[in-house]
A protein has these predicted regions:
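Class I SAM-dependent transferase core
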Residues: 1-71, 75, 108-122
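Short loop/edge segments at beta-strand edges and connector loops
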Residues: 47, 126-128, 198-200
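Conserved SAM/SAH cofactor-binding pocket of Class I
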Residues: 61-151, 157
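Helix-to-beta-strand junctions that scaffold the AdoMet/dcAdoMet cofactor pocket
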Residues: 92, 164-166
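Short alpha-helix immediately C-terminal to the canonical SAM-binding loop
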Residues: 106-108, 178, 182
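Short "lid" loop at the C-terminus of a central beta-strand within the Rossmann-like core
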Residues: 130, 175-179, 204
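Conserved beta-strand signature within the Rossmann-like core of class I S-adenosyl-L-methionine
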Residues: 167-177
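SAM/dcSAM-binding transferase cores
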Residues: 183-239
Length: 239
């Protein structure tokens, strides 16, 4: 392998996490497939290896610093090009992952990736978030739901919390100043059965990239009225 993964390896060490040579090779194959497919399909604006290493791979795996020990099933909602779901599935082969996306051509690409990497712990689902949240196959089925999707916290919570088991967690990857968003989303999170923990703020090592994790505990079942019909959570966020 000609590409240098030392940044990722060293960063993971600072987080007390390790990947085997096989897992690094799986990430490298994923990188190659991502860049190749990106030539004919808009998957990511980040294509330079060093940037992918930091902004996709390290960022996705930064969740290893806070992932609860009791998690066995994970859903990545709005997975897009497979982040954070594919790196997490590589890093955690003993956990079961469901990756959901609304665009079927992205799901088809990710199926190619899953097959090429031999990931037996990944299920791919083509569905809108609102549909998935109302489908009994997925509703309240997961110990942990994660999302790197760009949306306000109220909207993301309406998409994601219906999928979380009572006693489970929703973790949102965020960047930038989120204080106002947090203040505005408190009632929405509570309506959906969640309780927000204190945000976890950090910088990706050796970069000026600041990130935060919003961890929401699922304390009670989400009312049947949520998620609302397709398009409504984004147009009219709960407050």
């Amino acid at each position: 392998m000609s590409r240098d993964y030392s940044y990722l390896i060293n960063t993971l060490k600072t987080w007390n996490f390790e990947l085997s040579d096989k897992q690094i090779n799986q990430l490298d194959t994923f990188y190659e497939m991502l860049i190749e497919k990106n030539k004919v399909m808009n998957l990511t604006a980040i294509t330079e290896f060093d940037e992918v290493l930091v902004k996709h791979f390290a960022d996705s795996l930064s969740i290893c610093t806070i992932i609860p020990d009791d998690v066995k099933s994970v859903c990545d909602l709005g997975t897009g090009a497979g982040f954070p779901g594919i790196p997490m599935a590589i890093a955690y082969p003993d956990l079961q992952f469901t990756l959901i996306d609304s665009l079927n051509k992205r799901i088809k690409f990710l199926q190619e990736v899953v097959d090429a990497l031999g990931l037996t712990n990944v299920t791919l689902v083509h569905a809108r978030a609102e549909e998935a949240g109302r489908n009994k196959l997925y509703r309240e089925q997961y110990d942990l739901v994660v999302s790197r999707a760009v949306a306000n916290i109220s909207t993301l919570s309406e998409y994601c919390l219906p999928l979380v088991k009572v006693g489970g967690y929703f973790i949102s990857f965020k960047s930038g100043d989120i204080e106002d968003e947090i203040k505005q989303s408190g009632k929405a999170i509570s309506k959906l059965g969640g309780k927000l923990q204190k945000p976890v703020l950090f910088n990706l090592p050796d970069t000026n990239i600041s990130r935060s994790f919003l961890v929401i505990d699922k304390e009670k079942s989400t009312p049947k009225a949520y998620p609302r019909k397709a398009g409504t959570p984004s147009k009219e966020p709960l407050n």
